[in-house]
Regions:
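Residue-level recognition of transmembrane alpha-helices
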Residues: 6-9, 53, 89, 93, ...
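C-terminal transmembrane helix end/exit motif
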Residues: 22, 28, 101-106, 114, ...
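Membrane-interface junctions at transmembrane-helix termini in multi-pass inner-membrane proteins
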Residues: 91-119
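Helix-loop junctions and terminal segments of transmembrane helices
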Residues: 8, 12-37, 106-109
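Membrane-interface helix-loop junctions in multi-pass transport and translocation proteins
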Residues: 1, 68-69, 73, 111, ...
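Interfacial/gating helices of multi-pass transporter permease domains
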Residues: 1-13, 80-83, 143-145
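Interfacial segments at transmembrane-helix termini and the short loops linking adjacent helices
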Residues: 47, 65-95, 141
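Membrane-water interface segments that mark the loop-to-transmembrane alpha-helix transition
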Residues: 38-61, 119
């Protein structure tokens, strides 16, 4: 199981690398637009990055669904079916990409990064409470389900907190 997890994690690192340059490219612009209170351009950046991230994720998920088995068979092995694990991992990366946008292009630029410790601590609690059950019930797939659950909870909290901050910024 550890070997399968490691292979899937290595393959998902390729997807993670597709996301990072976008965050780096737009971070300074988002900080600038926030500081100058140029809400139209700030929102445009957030929406465009969000669209690109979703497109990358949907493309990866679709590719994995239709030809993942063949590609994995050519480069890794035909003996192990990694497609299901990769599908959950890719979906998890889509959820994480939303959190990345919230953190790097919204929460940190507006100076509210201190809230992240609390969010991640809560995520760790959720993980500790669910991991053992999920792993025992679903095996290796349970590990991926547990990570998906934790990332979804963290992302939903970030979206909610970002909305609250946004509402307060607009009022001022």
């Amino acid at each position: 199981a550890l070997g399968i997890y490691t292979i899937v994690e290595r393959l998902l690192n390729i997807l993670k690398q597709a996301y990072l340059p976008l965050i780096q490219a737009f971070y300074s612009k988002s900080c600038f637009f926030y500081e100058t209170r140029d809400w139209a351009n700030y929102a445009k950046i957030l929406i465009n990055v969000f669209k690109i991230y979703i497109l990358i994720g949907v493309f990866s998920l679709t590719t994995n669904y239709f030809i993942g088995e063949e590609i994995i068979g050519i480069f890794i092995t035909k003996d192990i079916n990694l497609v299901d694990y990769l599908s959950i991992g890719i979906f998890n990366q889509i959820i994480i990409s939303i959190a990345m946008i919230m953190v790097n292009l919204y929460i940190i630029p507006i100076g509210k990064g201190r809230v992240l410790k609390k969010i991640y601590f809560f995520g760790m609690i959720v993980f500790l409470l669910t991991f053992n059950y999920m792993q025992r019930s679903y095996g290796l797939m349970g590990v991926f389900y547990s990570m998906l659950l934790v990332e979804t909870v963290i992302t939903l909290i970030m979206v909610y907190i970002s909305y609250v901050y946004y509402r307060n910024i607009i009022k001022n």
